[in-house]
Amino acid sequence: VEIKGLNHRIFPWVLELVSRGLNVYLCGPSGSGKTTLAKRTAEALKLPFYYTGAILQKYELLGYMDANGNYISTSFYNCYKHGGLYLWDEIDASNPGALVAFNAALENGLLAAPNGEMVEIHPDFKCIAAANTIGKGSTQKHAGRQPIDGAVTERYAFVQMDYDWQLTAAIAQIDFDGEEKPIDYKVKRSYAQADYDKYFADVQAWS
């Protein structure tokens, strides 16, 4: 695993979770860096990065057959079959039917594609879901969000993500008082293995 450049303070946790084969659910406000964090995780693991926004129709997840009988694949299909890190952004604004199909593919290790192909999950398939809510439905700030079935959410390790002002200051090269910094300011944070083990023990307890 190779980590380069500036990263959000929770990046080491997310990287460790994904490295251990856990699906991660990133919950945080807009602009907190969820997509960037997922990209950096893929880079650190040297995996291709695949992205999907809110899925409103099931075919957007699984693909479809066109008028000429050709299968039109999707990011999920390609990542599931060939390996990589798949980010499903705004999963809480997506179609419940697509979530059921997605969960079945994760649980069974098989994907029934519309072209009749039965695809086995690639050993290097990794998954991060990102949302503004915890999957309990709409909030005062985020209307139109869907409650996510417990059969789906129980397959994820939930990680709360907020703005990292140190990272913001580092990118802008300013101190928190707004003064310009003449040198690069790199945010570094490390965790002992004991801390990781305690966290993953907690994750197992939530399951």
Regions found by a protein language model. Give the residues of each.
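C-terminal regulatory/interaction module of P-loop NTP-utilizing enzymes
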Residues: 1-207
